Design a protein with these regions (language model features):
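Short hydrophobic alpha-helices and adjacent helix-cap/hinge residues
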Residues: 2-21, 26-192
Length: 192
């Protein structure tokens, strides 16, 4: 009878050890599978991607209906990397999305969206002026809209928001969707 008790004790210990091992494995799996934290760069990348669906470019901007819609990211490798992952294999209105990382001296021609990461005010002004035509220029500069940007990221209590300039959009031949303007923190100018 004593052998049965020892066997029962051993079986109980094995069950306890197995339960502990399973609990440890489950905890480790949860820890390893947790989603990546949301970063400011990933939020800005998501906005840049989504903006493309709420802008009408003028007739003739794209030669063919399946031309790539190119988003340029200047000055933020983190935003560019997040955006590249986000837009891989995606289309907007039949246009595949692509990301370019222009460097100092590179031409900005061929871009449909240009995000200019934090730069000195004079540099932002020069970049905006050197990007003519129907380009959705997005900045993150306090004076971004005043410098000619169409959209500008702002920090609102730790949240990324954006402001919009209807005058800058009109000057570039762009039409911003009412749905986009409805979620902007503020909208400057007026539609004609």
């Amino acid at each position: 009878m004593q052998d049965g008790t020892v066997a029962n004790q051993l079986a109980g210990r094995l069950r306890l050890a197995a339960a502990c091992l399973l609990a440890w494995m489950a905890a480790a799996a949860v820890f390893c599978v947790q989603a990546q934290p949301v970063t400011e760069s990933s939020v800005k990348a998501a906005f840049l991607y989504k903006f493309t669906g709420f802008v009408d470019w003028p007739q003739g901007t794209f030669e063919r209906s399946n031309d790539v819609l190119v988003i340029g990211v200047l000055g933020s490798d983190a935003v560019a990397s997040d955006l590249e992952q986000m837009v891989a294999g995606r289309n907007v209105d039949g246009h595949p999305l692509g990301v370019r990382r222009p460097r100092e001296g590179d031409t900005l021609r061929g871009l449909h969206v240009l995000f200019i990461a934090a730069e000195r005010e004079a540099r932002v002004r020069d970049l905006v002026q050197s990007t003519p035509g129907p380009v959705l220029v997005v900045t993150e500069q306090d004076a971004g809209l005043r410098l000619g940007a169409v959209l500008n990221f702002v920090n609102d209590g730790g949240k990324v928001r954006f402001t919009a300039s209807l005058n800058a959009a009109e000057a570039r031949g762009l039409r911003l969707s009412a749905r986009l303007l409805a979620v902007a923190q503020s909208v400057e100018g007026h539609a004609r």
